[in-house]
Design a protein with these regions (language model features):
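Domain-level signal for soluble alpha/beta catalytic cores
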Residues: 1-113
């Protein structure tokens, strides 16, 4: 079971898995395509960060809004599946021992002030 993030933060410095997007690109994968076509590779990237000392993993949810998935791959009907897969890959990488966070990115719907 994942440790409580607030307890971890209260006790010490907590290391995250910086650079998931860039690491996926460096390994030759397109984001977010890797989520829908090769979740095992995504899980391996998370595992590598965890094995390197990351205590918290961030699900690779960049460009996973309906608008982005439609524009890039015609995957507008796969939004829930893609996001769930991204989260599950991060959770599985640590065997459930690390907390997993997500990110909110631009929805391109005018949400910026």
């Amino acid at each position: 079971m994942a440790k409580d993030l607030m307890q971890m933060l209260a006790a010490d410095i907590v290391l995250g898995d910086g650079g998931m997007f860039l690491e996926a690109n460096w390994r030759g994968y397109d984001v977010p395509e890797i989520i829908g076509t090769n979740p095992q590779a995504l899980q391996q990237i998370h595992r590598d960060f965890h094995n390197a000392g990351s205590q918290v993993l961030q699900a690779l949810t960049w460009f996973t809004s309906s608008a982005e998935l439609e524009a890039r791959y015609g995957w507008q009907d796969r939004v829930e599946e893609i996001n769930r897969t991204a989260i599950e890959a991060a959770k599985a990488a640590s065997g459930g021992s690390a907390p997993v966070g997500g990110c909110l990115v631009s929805t391109k719907t005018g949400s910026r002030a």
